[in-house]
Amino acid sequence: MGMTVVIILVFSFFVAIVTAETSPYIIHMDLSAKPLPFSDHRSWFSTTLTSVITNRKPKIIYAYTDSVHGFSAVLTNSELQRLKHKPGYVSFTKDLPVKLHTTFSPKFIGLNSTSGTWPVSNYGAGIVIGIIDTGIWPDSPSFHDDGVGSVPSKWKGACEFNSSSLCNKKLIGAKVFNKGLFANNPDLRETKIGQYSSPYDTIGHGTHVAAIAAGNHVKNASYFSYAQGTASGIAPHAHLAIYKAAWEEGIYSSDVIAAIDQAIRDGVHVISLSLGLSFEDDDDNDGFGLENDPIAVASFAAIQKGVFVVTSGGNDGPYYWSLINGAPWIMTVGAGTIGRQFQGTLTFGNRVSFSFPSLFPGEFPSVQFPVTYIESGSVENKTLANRIVVCNENINIGSKLHQIRSTGAAAVVLITDKLLEEQDTIKFQFPVAFIGSKHRETIESYASSNKNNATAKLEFRKTVIGTKPAPEVGTYSSRGPFTSFPQILKPDILAPGTLILSAWPSVEQITGTRALPLFSGFNLLTGTSMAAPHVAGVAALIKQVHPNWSPSAIKSAIMTTALTLDNPLAVGAGHVSTNKVLNPGLIYDTTPQDFINFLCHEAKQSRKLINIITRSNISDACKKPSPYLNYPSIIAYFTSDQSSPKIFKRTLTNVGEAKRSYIVRVRGLKGLNVVVEPKKLMFSEKNEKLSYTVRLESPRGLQENVVYGLVSWVDEDEAEFEVSCSVVATSLVQES
């Protein structure tokens, strides 16, 4: 009997543990429901939380006031269920993990110091760019304040380094957000002093993206002599505010929201986020959609305050529906190449040479080495020391490379077409040359005819400018449509993202081995993470010249002046260009209320989102629902049996000369009947608004899954302006 009792008690204890399992949640509240006796929102949130937690001390992780209205807290499932019945409760989101999207680029997008956007915008002087990432390495010369103006008088931020002297006129704020990290990892402890309390960047990602957006000019920058030159951010005289919310152990929604909340309060003009959700854990939330995306929800509050928000679109390409961060009010950025390659040269003893991609950082003697050619099989029992080993493509690259290296070989040549997609992966610590299989016969012929006397020489650290095609979208760059809101064409724009040189923590090992670590103050990284801060910098330049322009106006100027390239589901409006962004002629402007009106038209899908971002109920928020959003691009969905036309309305605002006429020009859109009315827009004054409609019809069905083109407005007098709107017609259906 005693044994039975023990078993029951143990089982009961186990059940108690399971049912009492806690998780951090983000709770959205309706502030209009706050009872009068409470003096502030935090005290109301705290009392509400206390009323549902009975067996432990309740604790609010964050109370949000600017980006969203609500709080984050650790709750059991039963406590969460009780909270749902409390006055003011709107919805919850589990504190989901977030992931990072991991010299020449300013010139590549049209910036130069003698004329154009840089001098006109005073290099972004007076504009504050907020970077939400892994922190910053303040000692980097990219963050010196030479030539940077005074800190803006309205700035409210703080510098949380141990020494405030680490901040200056360039780096004007740095703050840490780690409460969500600790709530999700309660056993986490600091293993070194200041590990989780300092804005110092020990990962490198945040330093890299901050310097892309607004790093100062640094001469003689390079990655081990690759990409050598003067490094500069896109807005080198803008100020930087750093919000460290990303950690090696994880990134959490609650910390990201708190960082956006603080950035709005501090007074930033631009927010750059090179991170985002994957929604892999949507079963833990109240449904699937934008309402569960912390960046989407919090950034809406930012644009309401006039803050421009730019995000990376993700690195899960080249597949359709892989894009993230696609809320209509966010600028979503894809990544492309910049016409620059890093190479090595392989020269055989017969003087036949081959170029190959390489970022080998070490020194390598420029002399002829004896060559051993291996057709296949093991390298064991072969004398390879101080030789260049040439292997065929049927060799397993990873394991054989390790074996060959252990033999003391000087270098390896791999004859293969299986180059890894992201060029970042050519950062081998051992000298390796990838040569295409089309050259196999030439190499085999030389090696076989000179079996005992074949030699070769390898040379590294070569940078080649002007390679084609460029710009070209990276295969890794995520493609639209955006799963959570496919009604808007995404991404918005393409920017440089492949092997971008930028600042790096000089004490963090960048490559090499444990025995021979290598360090550098600059690094070459690839990803949409690198593309987003390019656009953040461009937005800062525009904001400096047009301080009263809305976030939508800035977005429009960037999109309508882009260099059109390819499928907009991959490149958006095209590649960012700064040649005309300060004077686009016409803009598509949109107010926060316009976004709400459009969401209201999609009320079935967006009801909870509307409630969260408007802090009111549907009937109050949705008095003027609209099927149209004045966006600088168009996407239309057609099914195989659908012939009814799709109609879109757009409104252009004249920001150019007072009197100017524009005529419409339609390009592409093969197989579609396209009617634009009117065909001419005649503006008589500055800031005048004129509207037009686009009618798309597919009488015989789409010839391809994706058909695209442009509707452009060209001024008829001087052809100085061409204001382009990308248009996509598609039969793509999202997989369930």
Swiss-Prot record:
Its main location: secreted. Residues 103-582 form the Peptidase S8 domain. Keywords: Autocatalytic cleavage, Glycoprotein, Hydrolase, Protease, Secreted, Serine protease, Signal, Zymogen. InterPro entries: Peptidase_S8/S53_dom, Peptidase_S8/S53_dom_sf, Peptidase_S8_Asp-AS, Peptidase_S8_Ser-AS, Peptidase_S8_subtilisin-rel, Peptidases_S8_3, S8pro/Inhibitor_I9, S8pro/Inhibitor_I9_sf. It is found in: Secreted. The active site is at residues 133, 205, 529. Residues 21-101 form a propeptide. PROSITE patterns: SUBTILASE, SUBTILASE_ASP, SUBTILASE_SER. One of its GO terms (biological process) is proteolysis. Its EC number is 3.4.21.-. Belongs to the peptidase S8 family. This is Subtilisin-like protease SBT1.9. The gene is SBT1.9.
